[in-house]
Swiss-Prot record:
Residues 83-86 are annotated as: G3. GTP binds at residues 19-26, 83-87, 138-141. GO terms for cellular component: cytosol. Its EC number is 3.6.5.3. Belongs to the TRAFAC class translation factor GTPase superfamily. Classic translation factor GTPase family. EF-Tu/EF-1A subfamily. Residues 176-178 are annotated as: G5. Residues 10-206 form the tr-type G domain. This is Elongation factor Tu. Monomer. Keywords: Cytoplasm, Elongation factor, GTP-binding, Hydrolase, Magnesium, Metal-binding, Nucleotide-binding, Protein biosynthesis. It holds the Pfam family GTP_EFTU. It comes from Salinispora tropica (strain ATCC BAA-916 / DSM 44818 / JCM 13857 / NBRC 105044 / CNB-440). The lineage of its organism: Bacteria, Bacillati, Actinomycetota, Actinomycetes, Micromonosporales.
Amino acid sequence: MAKAKFERTKPHVNIGTIGHIDHGKTTLTAAITKVLHDQYPDLNPYMPFDEIDKAPEEKARGITISIAHVEYQTEARHYAHVDCPGHADYIKNMITGAAQMDGAILVVAATDGPMPQTREHVLLARQVGVPYIVVALNKSDMVDDEELLELVELEVRELLSSQEYPGDDLPVVRVSALKALEGDPEWAGKLMELMTAVDTSIPQPEREIEKPFLMPIEDVFTITGRGTVVTGRAERGVLKPNEEVELVGIREKSTKTTCTGIEMFRKLLDEARAGENVGLLLRGVKREDVERGMVVIKPGTATPHTEFEATVYILSKEEGGRHTPFFQNYRPQFYFRTTDVTGVVTLPEGTEMVMPGDNTTMTVKLIQPIAMEDNLKFAIREGGRTVGAGRVTKIIK
């Protein structure tokens, strides 16, 4: 029976290392795999530094990012851990969400304290909705002065509090990734302490299947004698036949109706689940009442909006993006889920223009409403070509 088998496997959590360049993010990632390999050899292969450092490139919404994916297990959990070698890769990953993080390990060198990129990563983590942070105070073996260590820890806590993380309460663990990698038992113990903090301070995320049903509509057609069918890939939740649904987005008004049947490859199903490509038969809905870009939802669980704040990354010319900057009142298309909607851009005060390769915040006003929530990802396009990527940080109206 599949269900019992699933409960036997460990809960899965996605995390990543963030922080300033050369503070030891990649060394720490390698050290975690080594220490966990030594502790639970049958569960964990060891991943050396140079394998993580030469991370393969992958594309997310047309943007190339170098990301290293590492897997490991503690006694309690199975982790997928992302580490990006370059600072630009981090920013791109966090904004495009190529690798989603349920929590992050913020690496700060005790020898330096928080640096500009430390601040930038924490700010971005807050903007893109990384919900929990655990701090690894790395290179602690190189600082003999206890007072200095306490001072650095205080600085990190204040930085996190300034971005609305619980800076006073979250775990800060003093580690030495290099010493742990060299096999020093005391520092290996500190790394196990860090992983225990990750196990206990980064809560289990809610699985997509447990959230309310949402399916973006990709296509609409009419089946003679049966009515209108909408197809798409269910993004989250579960839907059963004869449940009420709501159609949201693109039009001024949302429509409520009943889903009278669910099919896949012309077979009827008893439910549609997150991740499945399905057709939903809708009662009493005309073909012209629905279109691509709307979403089918559990009634009341998503609302249409036209105005929002966002954090975005604009592709460089080398990445196939624009060759020139854009200015106030720029009017590209914003691609949400399955459709493009034109929007007008207002840049933040003090920003006159945005260059290719920049990341920035902006306010956008769409010409049609989209079912929207905080953190929703989108691409910015011009004539079907991706020129940027972003996510909603705040809904205005």
